[in-house]
Amino acid sequence: MILHAQAKHGKPGLPWLVFLHGFSGDCHEWQEVGEAFADYSRLYVDLPGHGGSATISVDGFDDVTGLLCKTLVSYNILNFWLVGYSLGGRVAMMAACQEPAGLCGVVVEGGHPGLQNAEQRAERQRSDRQWAQRFRTEPLTAVFADWYQQPVFASLNDDQRRELVALRSNNNGATLAAMLEATSLAVQPDLRANLSARTFAFYYLCGERDSKFRALAAELAADCHVIPRAGHNAHRENPAGVIASLAQILRF
């Protein structure tokens, strides 16, 4: 079994750019940014429970990273960058810490490296279970209307929230709930030590208005790019800024 993805081919000899979306997104999420890099081959992946991979269920991060590796093999991707937002960034970090063959580097936008104590994990598990129950049982428009009121999305205006609620409500609530629980921060290991000891290139992107993740970025041994005029979802709020940062990263 492999994950559903859309592949766009560029010039031979350059590494692939493998894009991983955030929770409730899909393979289209990164395409405005990715298509600015037409010289590179691009793979836009649907994570389990989402888009064309909605029927794929997983029990945890090991299943997700295993499916991702099988997907790369199926496309004969031998050299690649992982580029992930939020959940996709966490998947990218988890996969990269396993040091797969052919990995050139990782670019993470607003991805959490992991909680650091049992109390934080217990609280996050309670919260994610409550959200998962709502995703399973309530209309998605109502759930996402509340989802985008969370502090991490404070930089969004009302129009941006309405647009996101409409877009995300096309998902399957049950499969979102399953993926939310399987990849909760409550079950993700703290990756800080692994990332500090890494052998791959590691870059971090965060919006200038995303105070939570700017603080987290400061804890990581990563080259951090702050995206102007953007909050947590920087590639949606300022795609040109993310394109500029990614172009700078890929030039090295």
Swiss-Prot record:
Entry-linked SUPFAM superfamilies: alpha/beta-Hydrolases
Q: Which reaction does it catalyse?
A: 5-enolpyruvoyl-6-hydroxy-2-succinyl-cyclohex-3-ene-1-carboxylate = (1R,6R)-6-hydroxy-2-succinyl-cyclohexa-2,4-diene-1-carboxylate + pyruvate
Report the InterPro entries cross-referenced here. AB_hydrolase_1, AB_hydrolase_fold, SHCHC_synthase_MenH
Name its pathway: Quinol/quinone metabolism; 1,4-dihydroxy-2-naphthoate biosynthesis; 1,4-dihydroxy-2-naphthoate from chorismate: step 3/7; Quinol/quinone metabolism; menaquinone biosynthesis
- Carries keyword Lyase? yes
Q: Could you provide one GO biological process annotation from this protein's UniProt record?
A: menaquinone biosynthetic process
The annotated subunit structure for this chain is:
Monomer.
**Molecular function terms from GO:** 2-succinyl-6-hydroxy-2,4-cyclohexadiene-1-carboxylate synthase activity
| Family classification | Belongs to the AB hydrolase superfamily. MenH family.
Known EC number(s)? 4.2.99.20
Protein name per the record: 2-succinyl-6-hydroxy-2,4-cyclohexadiene-1-carboxylate synthase
Task: Fetch the NCBIfam families from UniProt.
Answer: menH_SHCHC, PRK11126.1
What Gene3D superfamilies does this protein map onto? alpha/beta hydrolase (3.40.50.1820)
- Briefly state the protein's biological role: Catalyzes a proton abstraction reaction that results in 2,5-elimination of pyruvate from 2-succinyl-5-enolpyruvyl-6-hydroxy-3-cyclohexene-1-carboxylate (SEPHCHC) and the formation of 2-succinyl-6-hydroxy-2,4-cyclohexadiene-1-carboxylate (SHCHC).
Record key words, sorted: Lyase, Menaquinone biosynthesis
Which species does this protein come from? Escherichia coli O1:K1 / APEC
